[in-house]
Amino acid sequence: MTTKTVKLLVFLTLLVHGIGHLQGVVSGLGVKFNENSKTQSWLLKGSSERVNRIACLALYLGAALFGIMAALSFRAFLLPHHIWQTFAFISAIFSTFCLVLFPDALAMFFNKIGAIAVNLLIFYSIPFNGMFPSAAFND
């Protein structure tokens, strides 16, 4: 695989990961994707529906924004290139909290599996593997 192909795959993965979390934002706004879609967190059961929806909205919005910013930063579009890993890591943290606290806010089970896979890739690649191997991105 060429360097350009790897860069394109990383960019698209980060972008789709960020955009995918907008489903949770829509759920936080009260739109139901299906009969199982809900914004009630198992941790916030004693709180009102409004508090749950605001928490869902805020967490998924954070994951979406940081995911999109990571993708844009990776391509050095509007944001500096050197901070893309920080944005990706923050997005993965927000995403993990979203998936743990509000597992039914995403439209389909496939969306959850995809988000978990990208989060695991980010958690492995960035802090535990000494950042992404720079050799993969050399031109």
Residue ranges with predicted function:
Residues 2-139:
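Membrane-interface extramembranous regions
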